[in-house]
Amino acid sequence: MVKIKILKKTEDSITFILEGVSVAFANALRRTILGEVPTFAVDEVEFYENDSALFDEIIAHRLAMIPLKTPTDRFELDALELDDYTVTLSLEAEGPGIVYSGDLKSDDPDVKPVTPDIPIVKLAKGQRLVFNAYAKLGRGKDHAKWQPGFTYYKYFTRVHISKKINGWEKLAKLAKKRGLPTKENEEEVIVETIKPFYIPKEFEEYEGKEIWEEIVPDTYVFVVETNGELPVEEIVKIALRILMRKADRFINELQRLAG
């Protein structure tokens, strides 16, 4: 049975244990989060004036990398075919001063820069910058600007520490200081590595013998971080629904071919 246990959740990241799946599924989830979950990003820019020190292409690239809020209630983000919808972000600025992401005017109030203080370009006195930037939905597999964030996973393991070691108490205290769950019996201390646990150099001679690591089958520690376009929990939910839709499409195609 597949189980998910949330270990830690903040505004921009989530850490959870995923249990009961193969490494192939864990990697598929990771790849789907990075490459398939869609977000809005600037894809085309039309310049009318640019007296700044930067070429049009450089400004366009900077605009493309600004994270844009992506409303989950208006778009079917788990669909295999994306909605063809364009948002216009316009700007008319004159120096002296710095142009920030918050200066962009969106024709859709739900799609706007995540943070207003990302610098775009510095204008000297008399310099002007006028453009329309067009944002659309896209996927990270086509360009990194559409990635909703970052994710990685590791095998969930247990480190067994024998009490025959002189100074085993130090390792137990170190694990607790790191916030790692520990269990103890008469013979050993067991540390659950929900995050990395590094053995001090003075204990290296015991590794593989009195200190050994057990890999828990089909169990992984996932960390997902968001750029701000989507709530972090929505990124995981959308990725799982996309995987389900792809599996359903594959099964339907097999059934069709089987006649």
Swiss-Prot record:
It catalyses: RNA(n) + a ribonucleoside 5'-triphosphate = RNA(n+1) + diphosphate. One of its GO terms (cellular component) is DNA-directed RNA polymerase complex. It comes from the Archaea. Its main location: cytoplasm. GO terms for molecular function: DNA binding; DNA-directed RNA polymerase activity; protein dimerization activity. Keywords: Cytoplasm, DNA-directed RNA polymerase, Nucleotidyltransferase, Transcription, Transferase. Its EC number is 2.7.7.6. GO terms for biological process: DNA-templated transcription. InterPro entries: DNA-dir_RNA_pol_30-40kDasu_CS, DNA-dir_RNA_pol_insert, DNA-dir_RNA_pol_RpoA/D/Rpb3, RBP11-like, RNAP_Rpo3/Rpb3/RPAC1, RNApol_insert_sf, Rpo3/RPB3_RNA_Pol_subunit. Disulfide bonds: none annotated. Belongs to the archaeal Rpo3/eukaryotic RPB3 RNA polymerase subunit family. DNA-dependent RNA polymerase (RNAP) catalyzes the transcription of DNA into RNA using the four ribonucleoside triphosphates as substrates. This is DNA-directed RNA polymerase subunit Rpo3.
